[in-house]
């Protein structure tokens, strides 16, 4: 069963097409790496799936929720989208004035309306699961690149989305940390998560992904 189904997706920047006619299905528990040079549309595909950039044409279906061309998702559609999709950005985008733990439980309180005590308990469990439980009270500036990334993954997973999107996850990691990240993503996939990862890192894609898509000039070339 496909968690993500993209059909004839187009994304534009002004008058310029940055994504052209992309179609892909991703199954539950599958890791798909999207590769290509800078400017080929990798990140734009992820941002359209996440509802950050508008869809110019085509459709995106995530676990039964369909997005189509038009304005960005709002209201109940946006809330449903946030329950289905978590995104880890290249530079993590953690809130610098909040602890690692607070960064993770925030969405549980504001999106799922959980009591703060319950949200903190779940957030601690996620941080422990990802190997950074001892950094729960650290501020983002006190975290290493690998630690910050794991906190960002925990935050993206907090509301239990079936789909996780990652943009250039190895950019700030040394080779050892890249291997650890690949193992973490494989573990998440074995637990039933579906992952789509935009990356320049061919070795990481080979080790981590079940399938690799190559993008050229906004299209899936192979």
Regions found by a protein language model. Name each.
Residues 50:
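Helix-to-loop junction immediately C-terminal to a conserved catalytic motif
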Residues 164-167:
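Catalytic Walker B motif of ABC-type/P-loop ATPase nucleotide-binding domains
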Residues 175-177:
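Helix N-cap at the start of a conserved alpha-helix in ABC-type nucleotide-binding domains
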